[in-house]
Each structure stands twice: as structure tokens, then as C-alpha cells.
């Protein structure tokens, strides 16, 4: 397949492209792209390593979405060990995904979100989001997950993947 990316950055050569590489990577035509990950569905050993879960579910710590029956998990390492339902986890979860341990149910926004549920954001949630200083272009029935944080602030998390723990 080729070589993976080290250090979370990919380097590519394009002689027609202006040099924007970092000072340590100066080379004519070098393009440095940060935040690159290498994902595969090849059946390698790492793909079957269980993610060690240690946190217990607490309704106070894991808010539920306003428009989908799932809890929000802000950090992959904080996936609760004892929660049987659907969970919205960050996209960085894919780096730790074990198909023997978790089922990917769907995506938390856009057209793939509509495959999960026809229910978008409520008008009340949208109003609360903008009152709290939220930005962006959302409206009633927007196909994206939203929740109220522990302070009651309407929040739209960055892209979420909906998962379920297969072992519970």
C-alpha cells in the first residue's frame, strides 16, 4: 500500500506548487499537510486491540443529544465502560476502532445523519444556540447533533461518529 504518515503530517511534491513547507522541510515544490491520518480496514493485529475503558457512566457527565437518542463523549478515552446505548464520539475514535468491541452506527451530521434519523435540530435548540453566542449557519431541522452542556448551554460538537459497545 505504501508508507504511512509520521508525525501527523503528510509531505507531497508538486513542482507546480508554490513552496509553503515549514522551515525544516524546505524543498522545491514541497507541500506539507498537517493533521493527516492513515486508516485502513486491512485485518492487522492493531485493529483487534481492545480500547481499555475505565470510566463509569454518569448522566451528569455525559449529556444526551437533543435530537438523537445517544450520549455525547468528548474524548475517546472517556467512553464509559458500562453504557449499553448509542454514543457520539470524536472522529479521532477511528484511530482506536476495534470492530470486535464497537459497532459504528452512523455519522453525526449531514446526509449520513439522515440515515440514522429524520429528526434534525429543534427550533428551540437553534434559538438557544444563537442566544448563547453560537455561530455558524444552522436552522430548524438541521441534520447535526446538538446537546445542552452541564451549564445548560446549547452546544454543537465537532463531527461525531455514533457507536455502540458490542460487548455489553
Tell me the role of every PLM-derived stretch.
Residues 1-168:
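Class I S-adenosyl-L-methionine-dependent methyltransferase catalytic core
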Amino acid at each position: 500500500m505504501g508508507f504511512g504518515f509520521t508525525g501527523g503530517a503528510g509531505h507531497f511534491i508538486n513542482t507546480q506548487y508554490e513552496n509553503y513547507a515549514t522551515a525544516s522541510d524546505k524543498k522545491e515544490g514541497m507541500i506539507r499537510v498537517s493533521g493527516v491520518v492513515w486508516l485502513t480496514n486491512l485485518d492487522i493485529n492493531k485493529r483487534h486491540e481492545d480500547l481499555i475503558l475505565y470510566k463509569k457512566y454518569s448522566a451528569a457527565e455525559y449529556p444526551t443529544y437533543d435530537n438523537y437518542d445517544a450520549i455525547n463523549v468528548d474524548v475517546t478515552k472517556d467512553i464509559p465502560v458500562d453504557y449499553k446505548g448509542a454514543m457520539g464520539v470524536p472522529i479521532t475514535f477511528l484511530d482506536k476502532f476495534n470492530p470486535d468491541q464497537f459497532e459504528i452506527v452512523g455519522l453525526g451530521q449531514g446526509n449520513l445523519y439522515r440515515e440514522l434519523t429524520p429528526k434534525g435540530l429543534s427550533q428551540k435548540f437553534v434559538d438557544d444556540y444563537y442566544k448563547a453566542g453560537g455561530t455558524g449557519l444552522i436552522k430548524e431541522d438541521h441534520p447535526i447533533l446538538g446537546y445542552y452542556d452541564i451549564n445548560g448551554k446549547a452546544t454543537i460538537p465537532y463531527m461525531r461518529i455514533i457507536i455502540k459497545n458490542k460487548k455489553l
